[in-house]
Amino acid sequence: MTIYCDESGGLNAGAMTFAAVMLTPEAAAQIHARFRAVTGLRGELKGSRISLTERAYLLELFDRAGGRAWVAVAKRARLQPPADGQPPSDLALYAALLDLAIGSWLPETGGVCSDVVIDDGRYDPVILENVREAIQTGLGGWGRASLADSRRSEGVQIADVVANSLYNVEVASPRARRIGIIIEPMLASRAIRVAELTQLP
């Protein structure tokens, strides 16, 4: 299995969410093929760009395919300030959420090799390479951590939609109520689980 990762939002926007989605590459490709055939979508799949109906269909395909996700969430109003009183940097928050989301998966992998694929678009490549190396150290010999251009990774694009869905709910966006209805069955079945970050390490 592969864990695909992407984030949405930022503390300046009220919350940041980080989705770690577990799917086989084959399942991710099949979800994309069906979604694009039905909707006619061309180009990159982004949670911030699709309609509510398209989001519901994509997440239904994800659920049917046996996809699962841990989503780490940090909300500005509930995040305790660091000891120095300074607001955390975007990168520090990103790294903490990534660690929480991936860390939530590792006890459940049962020793099965898990590859972790991270979107390479948010930060400088050198910074992200350091993040990748830290994840690789945590995985040890159980898997491989890599960076991917989201435009070329079907799984990362699905993770983007999951992260964006939870972000909308957390910040109570105008679409939050409808998105909450869309994801409620997946939260109830634990296909999507949420871990909240309230304090940076």
Residue ranges and their predicted role:
Residues 1-201:
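Phosphate-ester processing/binding pockets and catalytic centers
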